């Protein structure tokens, strides 16, 4: 019950900043329009709407990292967390309390992307539902990564690292903008060692109904999600002991 009340408080805090929320939900749609326009004039298989949309949904989750990191960093700087550390809330309660309101926003963003892509020529099938469900592990990873960053960094640092660096890394390492095989070498090895490209390939496979291929990419995402969530809980636990 305490965790649910904390989650409700976090929801209200997120809704107090509708501009950032609108930007996070709307920017992936702008990219869909822009890249679809490029595809219409200079056909590139990577930018075909059925291939592009699943990748854009994965890229859009980078904004969930920024949301969660900013929320935690603001709470730390306002000393709210220091007061909450004196309550019976555990470190796990804090992490789940922050995650619960952001996860529906992430799934809403994904659904909006797919619905927005339909008039652009996206193939409509039940696989869209599978793709939305299948992105949950990656959404949890992104949110947990934001919570970890927010527990270690200040608001200004979060804006630079999560808002610029991680957003660009997510784009480059997911293979949304270019085929990783064209670069190859160390860059491709690094990309394959991280969850971003696996999430993009998972989404493409689920959307295409290729569940065997999707199964090949789910494990790295689950492992990264569990590891980052555990790291975030550990950071909160350490801060609670300090205060």
Q: What residues fall within each predicted segment?
A:
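Transmembrane alpha-helix boundary and packing residues in multipass membrane permease domains
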Residues: 32, 36-37, 114, 118, ...
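Short cytosolic juxtamembrane segments of multi-pass membrane proteins
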Residues: 236-243
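Membrane-interfacial helix-loop-helix junctions in multi-pass membrane proteins
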Residues: 42-46, 123, 174-228
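Alpha-helical transmembrane segments and their short interhelical loops
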Residues: 91, 95-168, 210, 214-222, ...
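Hydrophobic alpha-helical transmembrane segments of multi-pass membrane transport proteins
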Residues: 30, 34, 49-119, 165
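Short helix-loop-helix connector
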Residues: 85, 89, 120, 153-154, ...
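A short amphipathic helical element positioned immediately N-terminal to and/or at the very start
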Residues: 3-15, 203
């Amino acid at each position: 019950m305490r965790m649910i009340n904390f989650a409700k408080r976090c929801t209200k805090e997120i809704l107090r900043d509708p501009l950032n929320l609108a930007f996070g939900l709307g920017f992936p749609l702008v990219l869909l329009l822009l890249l679809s326009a490029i595809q219409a004039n200079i056909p590139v298989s990577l930018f075909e709407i059925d291939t592009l949309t699943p990748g854009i949904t994965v890229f859009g989750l980078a904004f969930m990292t920024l949301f969660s990191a900013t929320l935690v960093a603001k709470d730390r700087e306002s000393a709210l967390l220091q007061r909450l550390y004196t309550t019976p809330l555990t470190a796990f309660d804090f992490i789940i309390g922050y995650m619960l309101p952001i996860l529906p926003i992430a799934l809403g963003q994904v659904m909006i992307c797919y619905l927005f892509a339909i008039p652009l020529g996206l193939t409509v099938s039940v696989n869209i539902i599978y793709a939305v469900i299948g992105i949950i592990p990656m959404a949890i990873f992104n949110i947990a990564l934001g919570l970890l960053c927010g527990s270690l960094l200040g608001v200004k640092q979060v804006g630079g690292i999560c808002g610029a660096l991680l957003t660009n890394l997510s784009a480059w390492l997911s293979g949304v903008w270019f085929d990783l095989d064209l670069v190859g070498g160390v860059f491709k090895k690094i990309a394959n060692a991280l969850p971003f490209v696996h999430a993009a390939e998972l989404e493409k496979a689920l959307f295409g109904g290729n569940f065997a291929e999707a199964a090949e990419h789910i494990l790295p995402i689950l492992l990264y999600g569990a590891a980052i969530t555990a790291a975030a809980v550990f950071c909160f636990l350490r801060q609670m002991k300090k205060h």
